[in-house]
């Protein structure tokens, strides 16, 4: 049963964080918000993991890339 919910467990429907909180603009300078959508290795998390809608995922990706370019966020995290 690869890919299915675990024995009797029901998956919770993911809700878009931005829609639920009424956020209409994602600012590239708000690094604390952007860090919520980046993996521990520094990669942008996909929609299927975060539950973000397509519209806000595009805005989020653009904001993260701008933030990286301005050196507010790292491109990759260092190994320890």
Curated annotation (Swiss-Prot):
The keyword Ribonucleoprotein applies. One of its GO terms (cellular component) is cytosolic small ribosomal subunit. Gene3D superfamilies: Ribosomal protein S18. It comes from the Bacteria. InterPro entries: Ribosomal_bS18 (IPR001648), Ribosomal_bS18_CS (IPR018275), Ribosomal_bS18_sf (IPR036870). Keywords: Ribonucleoprotein, Ribosomal protein, RNA-binding, rRNA-binding. GO terms for biological process: translation. The keyword Ribonucleoprotein applies. One of its GO terms (molecular function) is structural constituent of ribosome. PROSITE patterns: RIBOSOMAL_S18. It holds the Pfam family Ribosomal_S18. PANTHER family: 30S RIBOSOMAL PROTEIN S18, SMALL RIBOSOMAL SUBUNIT PROTEIN BS18M. Binds as a heterodimer with protein bS6 to the central domain of the 16S rRNA, where it helps stabilize the platform of the 30S subunit. Belongs to the bacterial ribosomal protein bS18 family. Part of the 30S ribosomal subunit. Forms a tight heterodimer with protein bS6. This is Small ribosomal subunit protein bS18. It comes from Staphylococcus saprophyticus subsp. saprophyticus (strain ATCC 15305 / DSM 20229 / NCIMB 8711 / NCTC 7292 / S-41). The gene is rpsR.
